Amino acid sequence: MSFASDMKNELTRIEVDESNAKAELSALIRMNGALSLSNQQFVINVQTENATTARRIYSLIKRIFNVEVEILVRKKMKLKKNNIYICRTKMLAKEILNDLGILKKGVFTHDIDPDMIKDDEMKRSYLRGAFLAGGSVNNPETSSYHLEIFSQYEDHSEGLTKLMNSYELNAKHLERKKGSIAYLKEAEKISDFLSLIGGYQALLKFEDVRIVRDMRNSVNRLVNCETANLNKTVSAAMKQVESIQLIDEEIGLENLPDRLREVAKLRVEHQEISLKELGEMVSTGPISKSGMNHRLRKLNELADKIRNGEQIEL
């Protein structure tokens, strides 16, 4: 089961009072519901691919409105042949939609009814219902952090974005081919959203994976940095050794000034160590890294003169 499915299963087990239940159900029906006419009777159908979400819709409708609800199961025929669950009620359809702020004076509204988000708990419940209806979140182990809520209606998606940002989540709004999404890209904001809607187990798992992942990335960056520094040190040492070998072949190390001769011999004998370590091995006393670098640069310059056939003065 995916991280998003586990999270939705957790959300459907949250106990809420009637006002918060209405807020959650309002989002679920607005986003996944449809009104049809059958035998001169209005029917509400609420569709989802998540079995636990279907049970949540079923229980909320029965609890709030005390009407008969049936759950139908259909097999999706395209692409992934998942089950589709349809919660259907034929009783008080228009009254239910009116009470949930979806139908006003016989007209469907696409924005969020202010009566459904009157206080903090109702806002959280509405966002929870919206996530159950059209939400998805990447597994935190994947390459990018992403949480989104899809809505068919742009007005509603913009309302969700605004509602999310009332909690400083830095949500963004984006139009898609068949609707719009409100989405989050920052790991910390996704964590805040999970906490906001009551997904505490999902939050713990998300944070555990994120901490391990961030630690792994930090270690990788450190290793890469150290590897780059090591490669740089080795490359510089190889060039220095080549220069020293050329000097030895052409004029002999014994003809170098004492301060250069000892450094040249130390570098050839200890090619793998850093300049700081090399400087500590000088017989006349430790030499700083910059001092060693200066002497080795002198040896490189001397080798370059030999390569270019220039006159050499020791």
From Swiss-Prot:
Keyword annotations: Cell cycle, Cell division, DNA-binding
Keyword Cell division: yes
An annotated GO BP: cell division
TM regions (residue ranges): none
Disulfide-bond pairs as recorded: none
InterPro entries reported for this sequence: Homing_endonucl (IPR027434), Sporu_reg_WhiA_N_dom (IPR018478), Sporulation_regulator_WhiA (IPR003802), Sporulation_regulator_WhiA_C (IPR023054), WhiA_LAGLIDADG_dom (IPR039518)
DNA-binding stretch(es), residue numbering of this chain: 274-308
GO molecular function, one term: DNA binding
Protein's UniProt keywords contain DNA-binding: yes
Similarity remark: Belongs to the WhiA family.
Protein function: Involved in cell division and chromosome segregation.
Identification of the protein by name: Probable cell division protein WhiA
